[in-house]
Swiss-Prot record:
InterPro entries for the chain: Glycosyl_transferase_4 (IPR000715), PNAcMuramoyl-5peptid_Trfase (IPR003524), PNAcMuramoyl-5peptid_Trfase_CS (IPR018480)
Higher taxonomy: Bacteria, Pseudomonadati, Pseudomonadota, Alphaproteobacteria, Acetobacterales
Cofactor: Mg(2+)
Disulfide links within the chain: none
GO terms for cellular component: plasma membrane
First-listed, main subcellular location of the protein, grouped into a coarse class: membrane
Organism: Acidiphilium cryptum (strain JF-5)
Protein name: Phospho-N-acetylmuramoyl-pentapeptide-transferase
Function: Catalyzes the initial step of the lipid cycle reactions in the biosynthesis of the cell wall peptidoglycan: transfers peptidoglycan precursor phospho-MurNAc-pentapeptide from UDP-MurNAc-pentapeptide onto the lipid carrier undecaprenyl phosphate, yielding undecaprenyl-pyrophosphoryl-MurNAc-pentapeptide, known as lipid I.
Length: 362
């Protein structure tokens, strides 16, 4: 919005020329989202508490202390993230850019699905929410729509291929099936963040870290000079997603202020499904789907732990982990919640560095 409002007046007010620079607008987006979160957070939390007298339903089969320590904490805090992210993006991004709208669509769409899930959990007082099959169908429809939209915006030479990091210009062609691959990336990322969101601050910090990595990736991929120098795919227009990712960082930090242990609010599926969808769609748009799996490796490991646990239990009647997802396994082993969370953050930082390294290793 500011881009469209200020750009025509650059000749009269030279300072407005700053609005041309993605880096300036990215910084503004991050700061704006942070301020919106700080201003809106206390009011939103009070409102959620007034609506949710008993707070988020807690899993009866989870760690015992959760039934005591987390009882009464309101959920749907993802509203705070979505509002701050959307307001900041609309304010600072170039709204003529199709990638921005596609990524916003999947983020808000998955957030709406998460809201429905949280609402059913609260009204029915259980941890089930929207039936799994219905949730997957809605995710698939939204993801496929966004995937088709994004691929239509891309240069035809790379639109239907999956980029392989490290190897120069190695692309795996999928042809007309690529939107299905992109849909899987978005759905997988969304559900992976959702599974990771089980402890105070556990999901939001790795999300912020991944968003930081993709802020840089979006800027480089959308810049002809830098992409040529690094020998990565040049995708015109995706530089604008650096503004979106920066807004996500600011919104995430603002939410963390209230989600730090002991959490005053949980993001719920409203936040976790939306955040994963945001990361997945940005990865698809920047042709860095595999890099997301590396950078967000913590989310991948958490998801795999659930898949392995369910598969092995159905096959043998025994469990591989004391409890899944993996963070609950370590809780059951006696690790304190802050210990689990901080160590997982460290792992997320290491994986983010590995993801960044793929940009230079060729």
């Amino acid at each position: 919005m500011l881009y469209a409002l200020l750009l025509p007046h650059v000749a009269a007010f030279h300072a407005f020329n700053l609005i041309r620079y993605i880096t300036f607008r990215a910084g503004g987006a991050c700061l704006t989202a942070l301020v919106v979160s700080f201003l809106l957070g206390p009011r939103l939390i009070r409102w959620l508490k007034s609506l949710q007298k008993q707070g988020q339903p807690i899993r009866a089969d989870g760690p015992e202390r959760h039934l005591i320590e987390k009882k009464g904490t309101p959920t749907m805090g993802g509203f705070l993230i979505l509002i701050a992210l959307t307001v900041s993006t609309l304010l600072w991004a170039d709204l003529r850019n199709g990638y921005v709208w596609a990524v916003l669509m999947i983020t808000i769409g998955y957030g709406a699905l998460g809201f429905a899930d949280d609402f059913l959990k609260l009204t029915k007082r259980n941890t089930k929410g929207v039936p799994g099959r219905i949730k997957l169908v809605v995710q698939a429809v939204l993801g496929l729509g966004a995937a088709v939209w994004i691929t239509q915006l891309m240069p035809g030479s790379i639109a239907d291929s999956l980029a392989v990091p490290v190897f120069k210009h190695l692309m795996i062609p999928f042809g007309p099936l690529f939107p299905l691959v992109a849909m899987f990336v978005m759905m997988g990322a969304s559900n992976a963040v959702n599974l990771t969101d089980g402890l105070d601050g556990l999901a939001i910090v790795p999300t912020i870290i991944a968003a930081g990595v993709f802020t840089l990736i979006a800027y480089l991929v959308g810049n002809r000079i830098f992409s040529h120098y690094l020998e990565i795919n040049f995708v015109p227009g995706t530089g604008e997603l650096a503004v979106f990712c920066s807004a996500l960082i600011g919104a995430g930090m603002g939410f963390l202020w209230f989600n730090a242990p002991p959490a005053a609010v949980f993001m719920g599926d409203t936040g976790s499904l939306a955040l994963g969808g945001a990361l997945g769609s940005v990865a698809v748009a920047t042709k860095n789907e595999i890099v997301l799996a590396i950078t967000g490796g913590l989310f991948v490991v958490e998801t795999v732990s659930v898949i392995v646990q369910v598969f092995w239990y159905k096959r043998t009647g025994r469990r591989v982990f004391l409890m899944a997802p993996l963070h609950h396994h370590f809780e059951k082993k006696g690790w304190a919640e802050p210990t689990v969370v901080i160590r997982f953050w460290i792992v997320a930082m290491i994986l983010a560095l590995l993801g960044l390294a793929t940009l230079k290793i060729r």
